[in-house]
A protein has these predicted regions:
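Histidine-anchored nucleotide/phosphate-binding helix
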Residues: 123-132
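Ferredoxin-reductase
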Residues: 2-87
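Short, surface-exposed secondary-structure boundary micro-motifs
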Residues: 43, 96-97
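A short, basic/flexible loop-to-alpha-helix module at the beginning of a structural domain
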Residues: 97-107
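A conserved mid-domain beta-alpha-beta active-site/ligand-binding segment of alpha/beta enzyme cores
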Residues: 191-195
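Cysteine-dependent PTP/DSP-like catalytic domain, specifically the C-terminal lobe
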Residues: 133-187
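Conserved small/polar residues in nucleotide/adenosyl-binding loops
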Residues: 197-204
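Ser/Thr-glycine-rich phosphate-binding loops at phosphate-binding pockets of nucleotides
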Residues: 117-122, 198
């Protein structure tokens, strides 16, 4: 029995020359906790075995599709092929999600800090769409550090779309703090995520 589901690509979005996202179908038997990851891969001509890599699931566990957020690497064993996906293509998704970056491993508290750079944002895309996160914490502070402003993938989701969500909107407005950070261009939050977290983000900790 195969360890992978065969899923069909539903959409592909290229944020810029460095990052892209894609969605695919989701087998109805796939169950996961927000924040977990799966192995994603492709079967390539001339290759006996599929090429697979670990990818955090960017979609929430209540959504019918799967979403993944990836960097583009021209000589990457998988990403050099994955970045050329088209709607209708087949991708492999492992049947057993794993990972401990999940809410069930955390005690409820006052604040939940989510620190990420680049595609490290992926698991937090699912967690920030999890109603349980807003039930368990008074504030959720998401920091996303990138080099350039154009690298701020999902910026509109956090500045507009989530707040307008039919079910999550009110919770997001009340509890989610989005803190985008750019290190190599002028920006409202400019610098490295580690330095800004210990300085500017301290204001949020003291409030």
């Amino acid at each position: 029995m195969s360890a992978y589901f065969e899923e069909q690509v539903l959409s592909v979005y290229h944020w810029n020359s460095s990052y892209f996202s894609f969605t695919c179908t989701r087998n109805e038997s796939l169950r996961f906790e927000n924040g977990q990851f799966v192995m994603v891969g492709l079967r390539l001509p001339g290759q006996e075995r599929p090429i697979v890599r670990a990818y955090s699931i960017a979609s929430a566990n209540w959504e019918e599709h799967l979403e993944f957020f990836s960097i583009k690497v021209s000589d990457g064993a998988l990403t050099q092929h994955l970045q050329h996906l088209k709607v209708g293509d087949t991708v492999l998704v492992s049947k057993k999600p794993t990972g401990t970056l999940v809410l069930s491993d955390l005690f409820p508290g006052k604040r939940l800090y989510l620190l990420s750079t680049g595609t490290g944002l992926a698991p937090f895309l699912s967690i920030t769409k999890d109603p349980e996160a807003y039930e368990n914490f008074e504030k959720i502070i998401l920091l996303h550090g990138v080099r350039k402003k154009e690298d701020l993938a999902y910026y509109t989701r956090f500045t507009k779309e989530l707040a307008e969500h039919e079910y999550l909107g009110d919770l997001v407005k009340e509890k989610l703090v989005y803190y985008p950070i750019v290190s190599r261009e002028k920006f409202i939050h400019q610098g490295r995520i580690c330095l800004l977290y210990t300085s500017d983000a301290a204001d949020e900790r003291s409030s």
